[in-house]
A protein has these predicted regions:
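An exposure/low-complexity boundary signal
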Residues: 37-40, 889
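Bacterial N-terminal signal peptides
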Residues: 25-37
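N-terminal pro-sequences and low-complexity stem/linker regions of secreted or lumenal proteins
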Residues: 475-970
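Predominantly soluble domains enriched in secretory-pathway, periplasmic, or organellar proteins
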Residues: 42-505
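N-terminal secretory signal peptides that target proteins for export/translocation
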Residues: 1-22
Length: 970
């Protein structure tokens, strides 16, 4: 094999500047394991006060509230990297291993398995430097390393005697939608997106790889194509060969000892038939649950490699992922079933299923869902498997003996979200790729005396863990229990057993007890950190210098969010509230599902297959336990959904035009409805209905959404001002009040604080602040105020910085039943605590391990009868920044700007138009670093450098928009 055809001299010259081929020692972060005897003696607290990040005892707290105490030695892979998969070099004397990454400038990192030193950050010779979610393997002789790159390449790299990579060839494996079958008359065609929607012409999304015994062929799974492809390694350069259809969304491939039979795990299960209920996933119709829309089949394809023919298809648990052979059996990790399917390879039949259930659960209802097994390493000599549990930050030690009644022997604590595990038999160690490592903590934005953490500063790691002796495994298991707060017995006990005859209180002691709160409103907003909005509130732990959307002290003296600042004067100020998510795609999942399921989370940060965000449209992104709204619906509660999990909008104006009205037209209609003077034709001042109210037609393929959604409320669309959204809601709310039919749960997606719409960032924040303020105003002045609670949260905090952690975000609870005019609440809470609080009030069962162990937000609710003043209504204040600022002729006043500032502003306004053109309807489709700089500069008058930087940078330095069609926000 020669890689010369894939590079040229200029590439080689530039490559030396970006390649780090020298030894790079650990930085000292988590370089050694912690003492379990000290930590395991601790007890989880129901209402902890710690902040995310490093703790005084050497542990770390990550953004979902888990404690991280990884065993063994930790390999620091550097800033902004996700560790996805790991491969051990079979040449023992090299003592090296390779890590496949995402989100970095290199695809692969090579490290020393003895010392943990990173030896090489490898950047490919071709134009594609991306990694992938899975797919890395050495040839049997250790001379080649094959790995997938999610920009439609499979790369074959030469390995030298020291284990370093020297040369490579990239094989382009094109996207091909001819392997997708469509059934136009099958459900849910009547209200979902057409078959083939969301298929990306940008990439085939290569994943799992394997090599033939003789090294003549490589085999790669093309996840979006739903195919297996052969690559001829004897050709110069290597070339793609036969491609065949397997199951939906193939994940991993292993080759049997006979060298001719391959097994492929298919996360999306079998191909759909016309009789199946289907939900789209990246263009493919997935066999789905007819209520919540999640995938309901998982399969393994058996392939004869010489003929490239599928011999049979084996049904497994849900979302089968990692696999490993054990004797005459194949072990398959079922990520969404918390099980391992044991397949007899002689008959290709599942002989038994190993249960990896977590040691917690609602009494009488079985174990809690959500271990997330995804990778398996086998010690055949000792009949033990080591299984990575993505959602437990642990490796399960599993007894493979056929008669084992309690197969899980214990658990080993590793770092955040383990995605791959390999057994190094020579060193008797486990090599574990930790997808999220220690969280997004080591931000480069702490330079120059300013700390500004952001969710995108991923710090994936590798754990090198000595195989534990039986005497140490018990202590490790106890540590895992503590780290995940599975010891919070009071939270588990309060998740059931309620008595409907108990005296009602606002926040019931048990789920099932009655509540005084009959109406829950959940408002979801977009992408802000705590410091951006509330960093200037003296009572909280904020950094005023980062409060660019605050009371005006950091934004030219004009208050941007006056209503939010009034809320936290009367209602609880939560200065330790976190969004576990990195961005919108996993953010809405955390809110609605209490977790971000593996198939969704593992795509981060490239999001090639899909980007569900708050929009529906991907069966693989949903857990089979459903959503917060579907739980309420299943319980028989009336529900209304405004915007969340809606797939698309169509438009039809009263004059018959299908063109979407402009931002200005929507805004003028809103002003007319509200009785303002800015009334354009055809409305008149004081109109009683919105002229464009029936222009919008929203759709969702999820029945649990479609049957409860408000059809004329828009999904994500920055071309629509939030005032128009609120006016639509006001009409609906007034009708429900008059009819006495206000539902038990209303969910509203009010999203213009996302920015990059037509107005300036300050105007969009002001629009959002006013919109939510008006909703609170309407509810508090209504007859149902005395039985209502309003929960407000961001889906994520990605478009800003925070001096504590990039995931810290503003959260609010507005109700007569919360503590008012009280002290700041420093309790550590996350979105999942808010979800659990809603479940506690409405009597909804927890969906998984995360909301099961989450504490209801009891520190914020009044004990006993609230004071009479708590029931007084709250009145919003008007915006102080024109909401149309930046639209049309309403430009920003730059008369006092210097020529240099005017030049900077002009360049950045042009850049904003460039990155947002045609993307108003797609969450996070712009490069976040560019957006964050734009928002910062616009809010600080182009006079303050972005946190961690020395100067105000011109827009010309930002030439990295997200690739077209990949659904990426990076």
């Amino acid at each position: 094999m020669s890689g010369k055809a894939s590079r040229n001299k200029p590439q080689k010259k530039s490559r030396k500047k970006s390649r780090l081929n020298c030894m790079r020692p650990l930085t000292g972060v988590l370089a050694a394991g912690l003492s379990f005897s000290t930590l395991a003696a601790a007890q989880s607290k129901e209402y902890p006060k710690y902040f995310t990040g490093p703790q005084s005892n050497g542990s770390w707290v990550v953004s979902d509230g888990a404690v991280i105490t990884p065993a063994g030695t930790q390999v620091d892979l550097g800033i902004r990297v996700r560790a996805k998969a790991i491969a051990l070099n079979p040449t023992a004397k090299s003592h090296t291993a390779a890590v496949l990454t995402l989100g970095a400038t290199q695809a692969v990192e090579i490290f020393d398995t003895n010392t943990g030193n990173v030896l090489q950050n490898y950047v490919t010779f071709g134009t594609d430097s991306s990694g992938s979610y899975s797919g890395i393997a050495y040839s049997a002789n250790g001379q080649y390393l094959v790995f997938s790159q999610d920009s439609s390449n499979v790369t074959i790299a030469k390995v030298n005697a020291q284990g370093l990579l020297e040369d490579d060839a990239q094989v382009f494996v094109a996207p091909n939608n001819s392997f997708i079958a469509c059934f136009p008359n099958s459900p849910p065609a009547s209200y979902g997106n057409p078959c083939g929607s969301f298929y990306s012409g940008y990439t085939s999304y290569p994943g799992g790889v394997a090599l033939s015994k003789d090294g003549s062929s490589a085999y790669a799974l093309l996840n979006q194509n739903n195919t297996l492809t052969q690559i001829d390694l004897t050709a110069t350069p290597p070339t793609q060969g036969t491609q065949i259809r397997v199951g939906n969304a193939p994940h991993s491939i292993v080759i049997a000892s006979n060298g001719t039979t391959a097994y492929i795990s298919n996360e999306g299960g079998r191909a759909a038939t016309q009789a199946d209920f289907q939900i789209n996933s990246a263009g493919t119709e997935i066999v789905a649950d007819p209520f919540v829309g999640a995938a309901i089949t998982g399969t393994v394809s058996v392939v004869d490699l010489p003929t490239m023919t599928v011999l049979s298809t084996i049904s497994t648990g849900l979302h089968p992922t990692g696999m490993a052979f054990y004797g005459g059996n194949l072990l398959v990790a079922n990520t969404y079933s918390d099980t391992i399917s044991v397949i007899d390879t002689a008959t290709n039949v599942v002989g038994r299923t190993i249960n990896l259930a977590l040691p917690i659960g609602v009494p009488g209802q079985g174990p809690a869902y959500g271990a997330g097994p995804n990778s398996i390493a086998v010690d055949s000599k000792n009949a033990v498997a080591y299984v990575a549990l993505y959602n437990a930050n642990a490796i399960a030690v599993v007894d493979l003996s056929p008669g084992a009644t309690n197969p899980v022997l214990g658990m080993i604590p590793v770092a955040y979200a383990p995605s791959s595990v390999v057994l190094d038999a020579t060193n008797n160690t486990l090599l574990v790729a930790n997808d999220k490592g220690i969280g997004a903590r080591l931000s480069y934005e702490c330079d120059h005396g300013v700390c500004g953490y952001n969710t995108h500063q991923d710090n994936g790691t590798v754990s090198i863990v000595p195989v534990p002796l039986p005497g140490t495994l018990q202590a490790m298991t106890q540590q895992v229990i503590y780290n995940n707060h599975w010891d919070l017995a009071q939270n588990i006990a309060s998740a059931s057993g309620g008595n409907p005859k108990t005296k009602p209180v606002a926040l019931p002691a048990k789920i099932g007890d009655p509540s005084l709160i009959k109406h829950v409103f959940l408002i979801v907003r977009e992408n802000r950190t705590y410091d951006q909005i509330l960093g200037d509130v003296a009572a909280g732990n904020g950094d005023p210098s980062l409060a660019v959307f605050g009371d005006g002290s950091a934004a030219g003296g004009t208050p941007v969010t006056p209503n939010a600042h009034l809320w936290v004067q009367r209602f609880p100020l939560l200065d330790n509230f976190y969004d576990p998510s990195r961005q919108s795609a996993d953010g809405h999942q955390w809110i609605q599902e209490g977790m971000a399921p593996y198939a969704d989370d593992i795509q981060s940060p490239d999001w090639v297959r899909s980007y569900p965000g708050g929009n529906a449209g991907d069966a693989l992104a949903y857990q089979n336990k459903g959503f917060l709204f579907s739980e309420a619906e299943a319980a028989g509660l009336p529900v209304k959904i405004y915007g969340e999990y809606i797939e698309n909008n169509t438009y039809k104006q009263p004059n018959g035009s299908k063109k979407e009205p402009s931002w200005s037209e929507f805004y003028a209609d809103s002003q007319c409805f509200e009785g303002g003077p800015d009334c354009g034709p055809p409305g008149t001042p004081g109109e009683t209905t919105l002229y464009y109210q029936n222009t919008i037609r929203s759709e969702s393929s999820i029945p649990a959404v479609y049957n409860y959604m408000v059809r004329n409320f828009p999904y994500f669309d920055l071309n629509i001002p939030d005032q128009f959204r609120v006016d639509l809601w006001v009409q609906d709310f007034n009708n429900d009040l008059a009819a006495g039919t206000v539902p038990a749960m209303e969910q509203l997606w009010i999203m213009d604080d996302h920015t990059t719409g037509p107005p300036t960032p300050q105007a969009e924040q002001a629009d959002n602040d006013l919109a939510v303020g008006r909703i609170i105003d309407y509810i508090s002045h209504s007859p149902i105020w005395s039985s209502s609670a309003i929960f407000i949260e961001e889906d994520d905090a990605q478009n800003g910085v925070d001096h504590i952690d990039g995931h810290r975000s503003p959260g609010y609870i507005i109700s007569p039943y919360v503590v008012q005019n009280g002290p700041t609440d420093h309790t550590y809470y996350t979105q999942v605590n808010m979800t659990r609080t809603i479940e506690q009030i409405l009597g909804l069962p927890p969906m998984n391990q995360f909301d099961l162990i989450a504490s209801p937000m009891g520190t914020d609710f009044v004990k006993g009868t609230p004071p009479a003043d708590n029931f007084l209504p709250w009145t919003h204040v008007p915006n102080q920044i024109p909401l149309s600022q930046g639209v049309g002729d309403n430009i920003v006043d730059d008369s006092k700007d210097s020529p240099a500032v005017k030049t900077l502003r002009k360049g950045w306004l042009q850049k904003k138009e460039e990155i947002s053109a045609g993307k108003m309807h797609k969450p996070d489709s712009e490069d976040p670093d560019t957006v964050n700089h734009f928002d910062w500069y616009m809010s600080t008058g182009f006079t303050r450098p972005y946190p961690g930087e020395k100067t105000v940078r011109p827009a010309s330095e930002f030439n990295n928009p997200a690739p077209a069609g990949d659904g990426d926000d990076d």
